């Protein structure tokens, strides 16, 4: 790497252009080999930066979602779980239900892939930059009960529930029903 290339990479890092910094040398070499115009070269650099930022945003959304593991629809065994028809799940994968603010409930016995499907749809939502949050019902209730004891129930509800475009609450069937409805 020439000293000038090194300075360009350092400047990119200083200006927080990590995508350009990571791709600069390879793109400069490609531009020289293909005799790209300066404008074409700059466009390639800017597209690399944009994609880098989008990837970081998707990673951040997935991290904030709090998934116990990353699951995808490609990993789901539709042959094993016959109660979830592929066509219906692929319809859900359009995430139109999120835009319509509709609820989706997966019902079935333990071990058929309800959590896998919920996480896979949630992960897909994070990749489309929807604010998404995953909770087990028990964790959500414990958090809300603690907030109520501290007099911060409304704030906790907003932070845990209302702030997200997609909220996934897993293992609801494992909680006892509490008279009064609120923790």
What residue spans do the PLM features occupy?
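Conserved alpha-helical scaffold flanking the Walker A/P-loop in AAA+ ATPase domains
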Residues: 89-96, 144-167, 182-183
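Interdomain "pre-motor" coupling segment immediately N-terminal to P-loop NTPase/helicase cores
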Residues: 9, 17-69
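Phosphate-binding P-loop
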Residues: 92-101, 110
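N-terminal pre-Walker A segment at the start of P-loop NTPase domains
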Residues: 71-93
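Conserved lysine of the Walker
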Residues: 114
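Post-Walker A helix-loop "phosphate-sensing" segment adjacent to the P-loop in P-loop NTPases
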Residues: 122-135, 145
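Hydrophobic positions on the alpha1 helix immediately C-terminal to the Walker A/P-loop
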Residues: 117, 121
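Hydrophobic anchor at the beta1->P-loop junction of P-loop NTPases
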Residues: 106-108
